[in-house]
Design a protein with these regions (language model features):
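Membrane-embedded transmembrane alpha-helical bundles that form the catalytic cores
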Residues: 1-425, 429-475
C-alpha cells in the first residue's frame, strides 16, 4: 500500500476520521494499531522483528540512562541495531567482497524488511541522544509510536526524538489549516509522482535496460531524466508523508528544499534528503571531529561520511562510488572556492552576480547528474560504459528522437509542460513563499487543486498507457 494509491488515501482518511473524535486515552493505542496495520500490509512477516527492535531499544535506553559507564552499552546497542540492518541488507554484498579476495563463501541474500534502513537510523539517533544526556522515554506506547509512525516508516523523513516525541506525548487535534496543508502536500506529491516521476521512469528504464542501443546524446538525456526522476519521486513521497502526518496533528521535518537550485555540492546536501544529511552530520561527522581538526582531517571526514552514506543506500560498490563522488565534489569545492573568490575580487566581479549564480547552479546540477549515473546503473561497470558513450558522443543523433525512449509524443508533451511547471516552482519558491502567497486566496487554492487533480487523472493515473512505478527509495 503506497502513498500514491487509492487504498492508502482511504486508509489515511478513515484513520484520521476515527482518530480525532476518540477520547484522549484511546488516541495513542488506536494510532499504534494504525501503524501496525500499515506495516503488516506491507510485510507482516517482518512485524515481529520491528516489535522486538522497539522493545529492546526501549529498555536499553533506560539502562543506558542509569549506568555510569555508558560508552560500552551504547556501542553494544549500536552494534546490535546496525548488525541487524547489515544481516538483512549487506550479507550477500560481504560475500561478494570476500570473493574478490579469493575466499569463496556463498552467503544468502535475505529479504529486506521494509523501512529497516530508516527506522534503524531513527532508533540509533535516539540512543545516541540518550547517551549524550537526553532523558530516556519512560512510556512504552509513546516510544513505539515514535519509532513506528506509519507516514515516515517506509522512507522517512528520519525524525529526531526531540522533535517527534513531544508531539506524540501531547497529541494535538488537527485543525482546518492542518487539513488544508495536508491536502496540498498530498496533491503536490501525487502530481510529482504520477505526472513526472513515473513518466520519467519510462525514459530512464528504457535507456538503462540496454545502453548500447542508444546514442551518447540519448544516454545524456536519460541521465538528466534520472536526476529529475529521483528528485520528483523521493520528494513526492516526502510530501505525502508530511501531509499524512499533519492530518494527525503531527509536523514532520521538511526533507527537500529545491536541491537543484544549489550553487555547490555542499549546498546541494543542505537541500537534498535533509533528514539523512543532518543525521550523518550530527551522529558521524561531528563525532569524527567535523572541521575542528584542520583541513586535511575535515576532508577525510567528509569522504568517510559520504562513503558510508552511499553504503547506507545499497549493498553495492556503485552506491559507495556514488557517495564518494559527492564527497570528492565537496572536497574540490572547498579547495577551489577561496581561489575563485579571490579571482572574482581581482576582476571586480561580485561573487553574488546573477549570471555567476546561474553558472554555479548549472555546474552543480551537471556534477549531481554525473554522480546519479552510478546510482541508477546496474553496476559500476555499466555506469562507466554509459559515461564513456556519452563523453565520446558515440552514435550521436540530431535531431534527438525521444520516442525511442518509450514515451509517446503526447506523453512527452505532458512531461515537458509538467517539468516547466516544476522548474518554475522551484526557482520562484526558492526565493519567495510561493505556495503560501498563491494559496492565500480561497477560490484560487481550490481551483489549483481541481486543475492539478484533473490533469493527473487524465494524463497520469488513468491516462492511456500509464505505467505506475514503485517509489525508488522503497528498495533502501
Amino acid at each position: 500500500m503506497t502513498p500514491n494509491s487509492f487504498a492508502y488515501i482511504v486508509f489515511l482518511v478513515i484513520g484520521a476520521l476515527i482518530y480525532h473524535p476518540l477520547p484522549q486515552k484511546a488516541k495513542k493505542p488506536f494510532l499504534l494499531l494504525l501503524n501496525s496495520m500499515f506495516y503488516a500490509i506491507g510485510g507482516v512477516k517482518f512485524l515481529p522483528l520491528l516489535a522486538l527492535t522497539v522493545a529492546f531499544n526501549f529498555f536499553a535506553a533506560q539502562k543506558l540512562e542509569r549506568i555510569e559507564r555508558k560508552r560500552g552499552l551504547l556501542t553494544l546497542v549500536l552494534v546490535l541495531n546496525l548488525g541487524a540492518l547489515g544481516l538483512f541488507k549487506y550479507l550477500g554484498f560481504f560475500g561478494e567482497l570476500l570473493g574478490c579476495t579469493g575466499v569463496q563463501l556463498s552467503l544468502p541474500q535475505l529479504a529486506l524488511p521494509i523501512g529497516i534502513s530508516f527506522y534503524t537510523f531513527v532508533i540509533c539517533g535516539y540512543m545516541i541522544d540518550v547517551y549524550r544526556g537526553r532523558e530516556a522515554e519512560r512510556n512504552f506506547l509513546d516510544f513505539a509510536l515514535f519509532t513506528t509512525f506509519f507516514p515516515a516508516i517506509l522512507s522517512g523523513p528520519i525524525e529526531r526524538s526531540k522533535s517527534l516525541l513531544p508531539q506524540i506525548k501531547q497529541p494535538r487535534r488537527a485543525n482546518a489549516d492542518d487539513v488544508r496543508f495536508a491536502a496540498e502536500r498530498l496533491i503536490e506529491g501525487t502530481v510529482k509522482k504520477v505526472l513526472l516521476a513515473d513518466n520519467l521512469a519510462i525514459l530512464v528504464n528504457t535507456a538503462y535496460a540496454d545502453p548500447a542501443q542508444f546514442s551518447g546524446l540519448e544516454l545524456a538525456f536519460a541521465a538528466v531524466a534520472y536526476a529529475l526522476q529521483i528528485y520528483c519521486d523521493f520528494s513526492a513521497y516526502s510530501d505525502m508523508a508530511i501531509g499524512s502526518a499533519r492530518l494527525f496533528g503531527i509536523t514532520l521535518m521538511e526533507n527537500f528544499h529545491a536541491p537543484y537550485m544549489a550553487q555547490s555540492s555542499k549546498e546541494f546536501w543542505h537541500r537534498w534528503h535533509i533528514s539523512l544529511s543532518t543525521w550523518f552530520r550530527d551522529y558521524l561527522y561531528f563525532p569524527l571531529g567535523g572541521s575542528r581538526k584542520g583541513k586535511a582531517r575535515t576532508y577525510i571526514n567528509v569522504l568517510i561520511v559520504f562513503a558510508l552514506s552511499g553504503l547506507w543506500h545499497g549493498a553495492a560498490m556503485k552506491y559507495v562510488l556514488w557517495g564518494l563522488l559527492f564527497g570528492v565534489f565537496q572536497v574540490i569545492g572547498g579547495l577551489l572556492t577561496p581561489a575563485k573568490q579571490r579571482l572574482c575580487a581581482a576582476l571586480h566581479i561580485p561573487w553574488d552576480a546573477g549570471w555567476l549564480q546561474i553558472i554555479r547552479v548549472v555546474i552543480t546540477f551537471g556534477l549531481s547528474t554525473f554522480a546519479w549515473i552510478f546510482f541508477r546503473a546496474d553496476s559500476a561497470l555499466q555506469a562507466c560504459a554509459i559515461i564513456k558513450r556519452i563523453v565520446t558522443a558515440a552514435g550521436a543523433c540530431f535531431p534527438l528522437n525521444l520516442t525511442h525512449l518509450g514515451l509517446t509524443e503526447r506523453a512527452l508533451h505532458v512531461l515537458a509542460v509538467s517539468l516547466i511547471g516544476l522548474v518554475l516552482t522551484d526557482i520562484i519558491g526558492d526565493r519567495f513563499p510561493l505556495r503560501e502567497k498563491l494559496l492565500e486566496t480561497v477560490w484560487l487554492r481550490y481551483a489549483v487543486w481541481v486543475i492539478l487533480l484533473a490533469v493527473t487523472a487524465v494524463c497520469g493515473a488513468y491516462g492511456t498507457g500509464f505505467n505506475p512505478q514503485e517509489f525508488v527509495y522503497f528498495q533502501f
